[in-house]
Amino acid sequence: MNIRHGIIAMSSTMLVPLAAEAACNTDYSWIDKSCERISDTWKNGDHDLYIPLWTHHLRFAYDNDKIDSFREFTWGLGYGRSRYNAAGNWEGVYLMAFSDSHSNVQPMLGYGHQWMMGPRSGLHAGVGYTAFLTSRADIYKNIPIPGVLPIASLNYRQYSVNTSYVPGGRGNGNILFFWSRVGF
C-alpha cells in the first residue's frame, strides 16, 4: 500500500458516520444500539489526535534475524472522536494509519471501549477492546480484514498512552503496539 492509498483511506473516514447513521434503522436491536453508540460518539465526541509510538515484537516468538529485520519504531498519524459515557467509560471512533514492521502503510478504522478506573481529572487507567478493519500488504494483499483486540491505557486528563496485544504463534503476532492519544 502506498501513501496515495493511505490518503484515500483516511479521506473516506468522513463518510463512516453518515453510513453508520443510515444503517442504524434495522430490525435488530443490538445492531441499532451499537450503531447509535458509534454515531453518537462521532457526532458528540471530542476531537482526538492519535500518534503511533512503538511496535514491540515479543522476543520469545522470533529468532534474532527476524527481529533485526523488523522496524519497531512506528511513524503515522490518526484522527478520532471520543467521549466518556454516562457510566464514566471511554468510547472512541478512530482512523489511524501507521507503518507496520516492514515499513508498509497500515490503515486502521475502528471503535474502542474502555472501562475506566480513577478520576478523569487526574491519573486514571482503562482496559477494554477495539473492534476494527485494517489491511496489510503481507496479509491477504491489502484486502480489508476485521479484528478485535484487547486495549489498555494510562491517562492524565486529555492525554493517554495506550497499548494493544496482538496474539500469535512462533514467528507471527505476539506484538505489543503502543500509541498516544491527545484530546482537544
UniProtKB/Swiss-Prot annotation:
Record flagged with keyword Chloroplast: no
Keyword Ribonucleoprotein belongs to the record: no
Keywords: Acyltransferase, Cell outer membrane, Membrane, Signal, Transferase
Any one GO biological process: lipid A biosynthetic process
Residue positions of the active site: 57, 100, 101
Reaction(s) the record says it catalyses: a lipid A + a 1,2-diacyl-sn-glycero-3-phosphocholine = a hepta-acyl lipid A + a 2-acyl-sn-glycero-3-phosphocholine; a lipid IVA + a 1,2-diacyl-sn-glycero-3-phosphocholine = a lipid IVB + a 2-acyl-sn-glycero-3-phosphocholine; a lipid IIA + a 1,2-diacyl-sn-glycero-3-phosphocholine = a lipid IIB + a 2-acyl-sn-glycero-3-phosphocholine
Pfam families according to UniProt: PagP
Cellular component per GO, a single term: cell outer membrane
Enzyme Commission number: 2.3.1.251
Residues the UniProt record annotates as site (Role in lipopolysaccharide recognition): 66
EC category: transferase
Any one GO MF annotation of this record: acyltransferase activity
Subcellular localization, as worded in the UniProt entry: Cell outer membrane
Protein origin, superkingdom: Bacteria
UniProt xrefs under InterPro entries: LipidA_acyl_PagP, OMP/PagP_b-brl
Signal peptide: 1-22
Gene3D superfamilies xref list: 2.40.160.20
Family recorded in the similarity comment: Belongs to the lipid A palmitoyltransferase family.
Free-text function comment from the UniProt entry: Transfers a fatty acid residue from the sn-1 position of a phospholipid to the N-linked hydroxyfatty acid chain on the proximal unit of lipid A or its precursors.
Record text on subunit structure and interactions: Homodimer.
Name of this chain's protein: Lipid A acyltransferase PagP
Source species of the chain: Methylobacillus flagellatus (strain ATCC 51484 / DSM 6875 / VKM B-1610 / KT)
Gene label: pagP1
